[in-house]
Amino acid sequence: MHMKSIFILVSFLYFSFNANATQMGNVKGKRTVSLNNSVGTSIAKFFSNSPLEKFEGNSQSLQGTFTLNADQLEQSSGQIAFPVTSMKSGLSKRDDHMYGKDWLDAKAFPMISFDVKKFSGITIKKSDNSSVEFSATAEGTCTLKGSSKPTKAKIYVKYVFESENTKKRASGDLVMVDADFSVSLKDFNVLGKGDIIGTKVGENIDLDIKLFGNTN
C-alpha cells in the first residue's frame, strides 16, 4: 500500500472515531446520577472565618440527582439539597442559634438547595478506558432562607465506568464530584443579631461539597 493511501486510511479512522466520541469518551447521551452512600458519603462542609472566631461544620444529609449530558456537557443539570437542621458545627448552642429566625430560620425555610442549570469552562483532565475526569464551573441558583440567587461553583468530576470492581460498591457507573463556592449571608437576608456578622461570624461562608453517586 502506498504511503499516501496509508495516510488517508489513518486519517479516516481517526476522524471516524472522534466523530462518534464525546467529551466523555465513549459515553453518550444523558446519564442520571443519584447520590448513593454505597459509593461514598456525600457531605457539605461549611467554613466561617471572622476576626474574633473561626468555626466549621457539615451536613451529611445531602439528597438529589443530577444529569450529565455526555453529548453536550455544557447542558448538564441537577439539584442538590440538605435540611438546615442537619448542619452541625460541634456546639449545640451555636447550632440552635443557627437554626433560629435571625439566622437560617429552619422552621420557615427547612431546606438549602443548589440548582445546576449548566456547566461552563469545561476542561478534560483525563480520559481513558476506565474513567473520565474534568473540571468546570457549575452555574445555577442557590436557595437559602427563601431567597434564590445566581451562584457559580468550581467543580471537579470523576466518572468511573462500570467494571467488576465497581460493581462491588454499586451498579452502574460511579461518579464523584467535588464542588467549592461561597455565599454572602447578606445576599440571602441572613442578618443575625447586632454586629455578630463580621466579628464572630464571617460575612461570607465557604462551602466544600463532596458528592458520591451512581448512574441509573
PLM feature spans:
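Low-complexity, acidic/polar, glycine-enriched regions of mature
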Residues: A21-N216
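Sec-dependent N-terminal signal peptides
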Residues: I6-F15
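N-terminal secretory signal peptides that target proteins for export/translocation
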Residues: M1-M3
